[in-house]
Amino acid sequence: MSAKEIKGQLSLIVGKDFQMEKGCNIDANFPWLIEIGNNVTLASWVYLVAHDGASKKQVGYSRVGRITIGNNVFIGARSIVLPNVKIGDNSVVGANSVVTKDVPSGVVVAGNPAKKILTIEEYKNKLEASMNSSPIYEFEYTISGGIDDKKMKKMKKELTHTGGFVI
């Protein structure tokens, strides 16, 4: 479903510049308990789950809780955010993470359960250092940029033993 479809659904709050890649699932049972800030990206197959159906088998009620995602947040592919979680501004959730507790602003978390790995500043410094010794590619090296066979072969060869960066 697109961001436009989401915005109209039962009071789900979504900020500006929200990007949701394919396969994401935003809890259709309790969308009004989910708030997504500005400039947020949900990578492929992210799940935002505001209820715990397993509790119903035990106590007759589903546990529910709000999910609040701050501004400038990236949530990596196949991550799951569980009920009663706040993800602070300027944070990154690594791929395949399960977020069971609040994530402070300005950190990178990863794992199951998600734990702090480093600060955003440390992450940025690490990336910048890596960029100094890695191939860097412009927009024309993407499908959207109309990459051709020659550029694909060049990129594939250059990335044989290292990673690189694309705009």
Task: Indicate where each model-derived feature is located.
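Terminal amphipathic alpha-helical/low-complexity segments used for targeting or macromolecular assembly
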Residues: M1-S11, A114-I167
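Structural signal for interior beta-strand "rungs" in well-ordered beta-sheet cores
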Residues: I6-G8, L12-I117
